[in-house]
């Protein structure tokens, strides 16, 4: 059985729990809830857990280093489990995708996302799979304040559906491969 390291990006602490920038943590928490895998073990400068899901051995990781240092945590876990970049799936928020949309991608730049920038620096590559959870862009104001703000009330009302769609995309990526998953989820 192959193994996957599935990483949700976010910032630690209750202050950030419902912020847009924590969409990766939220998806990972939803996956943990659905799969029964507890993400409570302190390891790799983060919280981790492991188990079987989608016919794979999966290692779940929520770096607790703050977003701009996430790469350290991910690099530690990849080394420990002796996994390669092809075994890595990163879940993160994306300003360039409207709220409610979930898109899949292999490789690419960081697009100004500090978590992805840290991963590129620590891993020396961006050649890994991503689940991009759309948070949209602010109509007015600063992007930093926008991503660090909680989801709006109307967004919260449909957030569970977005998280479930993200988990469905992840499951299809693992079971049926990235091309099939991209053809379905990127067309939505």
From Swiss-Prot:
Q: Where is this site: Stabilizes the basic form of H active site to accept a proton?
A: 93
Query: Which annotated residues bind tRNA?
Result: 16, 66, 68, 114
GO CC term, one of those recorded: cytoplasm
- Give the residues annotated as active site: 21 (proton acceptor)
Any Pfam family hit? Pept_tRNA_hydro
- Main localization of the protein? cytoplasm
The task this protein performs is described as:
Hydrolyzes ribosome-free peptidyl-tRNAs (with 1 or more amino acids incorporated), which drop off the ribosome during protein synthesis, or as a result of ribosome stalling.
- Under what name is this protein listed? Peptidyl-tRNA hydrolase
Q: Which organism is it from?
A: Geobacter sp. (strain M21)
Tell me the classification of the organism that encodes this protein: Bacteria, Pseudomonadati, Thermodesulfobacteriota, Desulfuromonadia, Geobacterales
């Amino acid at each position: 059985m192959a193994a996957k390291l599935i990483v949700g990006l976010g910032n630690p602490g209750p202050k950030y729990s419902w912020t847009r920038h924590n969409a990766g943590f939220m998806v990972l928490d939803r996956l943990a809830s659905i799969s029964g895998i507890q993400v409570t073990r302190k390891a790799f400068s983060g919280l981790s857990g492991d188990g079987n899901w989608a016919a794979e051995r999966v290692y779940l990781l929520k770096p607790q280093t703050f977003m701009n240092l996430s790469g350290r945590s991910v690099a530690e876990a990849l080394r420990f489990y002796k996994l390669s970049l092809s075994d890595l799936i990163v879940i993160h928020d994306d300003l360039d995708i409207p709220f409610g949309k979930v898109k899949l991608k292999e490789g690419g730049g960081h697009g100004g996302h500090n978590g992805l920038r840290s991963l590129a620096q620590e891993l020396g590559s961006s050649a890994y799979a991503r689940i991009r959870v759309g948070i949209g862009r602010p109509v007015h104001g600063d992007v930093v304040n926008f991503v660090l703000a909680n989801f709006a009330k109307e967004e919260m009302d449909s957030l569970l559906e977005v998280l479930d769609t993200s988990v469905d995309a992840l499951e299809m990526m693992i079971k049926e491969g990235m091309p099939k998953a991209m053809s379905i989820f990127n067309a939505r």
